Amino acid sequence: MLSYCEYLAIKKMNPDDDCYIETIVYDIPECNDVICQWNGFELDRIFHLNTPNVKSVIAPQKWEQLMAEIRSSQFWLKNWNYPVYFTQAFQHIGIPLKNIRGDFERTGESDKTTLSVPRYKKTFLFQYLNYLRKRYLSRQSTDIPQFPDLFVQTEDSIFTGQQLTFKYMGTGIERIEPEVRKAFIFPELTSSRDKELAKKVSECQSVAIHARRGDMLSFNFDCYYGGYFKRAVKYIRQMVSNPKFFIFCDPGSVEWAKHHAHVFGLDFKHDNIEFVDWNKGDDSWRDMQLMSLCKHQIITRSSFGWWSAWLNTNPEKITCSPTHYFLTTHHF
């Protein structure tokens, strides 16, 4: 979804030019071993966007050549350096593109802060000390990092890659907000269970808590062991009368959440709480839809959760995140 927003930004700046998306990583199974691709590219299936994919304008034989070269590069083992190897492969099938995304092997940059976490970084002590260091630095500075301008106007044929930064403050998503909201209109709910939940969240001061662990646990360590959820829940209690908490988890985290009430600053015996854990597989995206229908959100460092908060149309919403430059109303 963030990538599609970048497409909209490029198209806005170059309205008369042909602009395409590419979904190559979803067709390479090995990529999923490094960065989870979940159910692959789903925007056309869910939102019926009919996005212009560059694959549609390349002859099948040329596309096979392109994919063979990209797979042989094993970019996913080279700091996810797809911009370099993708543009090289496009060049070799006669499509020269200027790489404006960069060279991750040269700069050490990547699309994720950590693609492969060394064993010593997985220890509780290391992660906790690292969290304390980051929290101290965060409290010392409220500066918003400078992110690349996503509204690029050019006469060159370019490969932009993915910045995935529209979820951050100062990146300009408001410039394409009408187009984004028009694109991401969820289909009507179909299951009786989802419909029942939608009715519940509309009739109370509903608070969605996105307790995503799974593949994002190393990035959200501080949320669970640094008191983030407790601070966010405490603030919600101060500002919202009779809140009801709806906890959304990935399938493998539900039981963990049910046995760790203290992590969330909740009392499962006395607080009004409901777990949402039935949307799985091809229906996983329904959780985003249901979370967006809640009055308020408490999210982690996850674009899935962030979209639920951003798409929430409640004018008095409170949206909480653990990073001071996330585009939410509050940070803890």
Question: Where are the predicted features?
Answer:
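Short, aromatic/basic amphipathic alpha-helical patches
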Residues: 31-49, 253-267, 332
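Secretory-pathway luminal glycosyltransferase catalytic domains
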Residues: 33-240
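Short, solvent-exposed loop/turn segments at secondary-structure junctions
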Residues: 25-29, 164-166, 171, 212-216, ...
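N-terminal pre-catalytic "stem/leader" segment of glycosyltransferase-like enzymes
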Residues: 1-30
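Donor-binding and catalytic core of enzymes assembling or modifying cell-surface/extracellular glycoconjugates
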Residues: 1, 240-327
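Residues within alpha-helical segments
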Residues: 4, 8, 195, 309-310
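Structural alpha-beta junctions
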Residues: 9-18, 46-54, 233-243, 264-274, ...
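A general structural detector for well-ordered alpha-helical segments in enzyme core domains, enriched
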Residues: 6, 229-232, 260
